[in-house]
Amino acid sequence: QKHILTGKQLAADYKVLRATLDSIDPSIKIAGVDVAYQIPIVGSLLPTTSEFLEHGGMESIDFLTWHWYAMESKRCPFHGRFAPATQKGAISTSTMDKGNKWANRMNALVKKYQLSVELWMGEMSLVSCGGAVNITDSFAGTFWYLDELAHLAVQGHSVTFRQTLVGSRYGLIEQSSLQPLPDYWGLLLFRSLVGQRVLGIEVHNSQGRFVRAYAFE
């Protein structure tokens, strides 16, 4: 707890980084502040990001970013901060809804501070700390991934980064064989079929959260 970086300190550090990079090449872009909501030991998302913005952090960055993991790996439990990884949880609508809630809160910060900035998802996967066997490396996690890509686009996120391309159990490509994993094919399908413009759409039926529809062109 003694070594947590505060939003105020991060704003000061990013100011130094901005000045350093400007002295080398002013065209270099900076994305930040890259905080995940579940991990208070390294700074909780809303308090840290709010404090960062209050102390002028936005003057030093070009893209406002945050990190998101929907479930918890056995490798590094965070004492109930989020649900343990299971296949049932991977396809649960409540798991899918969580990311939407936090994206809403990040958008609220953008409006509160009247920011004219692109909102990015700087890092995400269904399960934290390397993922989980038979979940993030299987089609069980692909439903969540596709829904996450769609709703983040609807929520105004210009860019979404996956954790990770190759490595552990949440990569898009298997580390030893270099064979594409299910989420790779899901992403390829998404990129092949989905356009760059989000269209407004609503679902009016009794299924509510269980039927999801997104439209792009």
Predicted segments with their positions:
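Conserved residues at the C-terminal ends of beta-strands
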Residues: 1, 67, 163
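Noncatalytic carbohydrate-binding groove/subsite architecture in carbohydrate-active enzymes
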Residues: 5-142, 155
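Aromatic/acidic polysaccharide-binding cleft in carbohydrate-active enzymes
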Residues: 121-212
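Short amphipathic beta-strand and strand-loop transition segments with alternating hydrophobic
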Residues: 213-217
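Short, exposed beta-strand "edge-strand" segments with a Pro/Gly-rich flavor and a Y/T-containing core
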Residues: 2-5, 20, 176-179
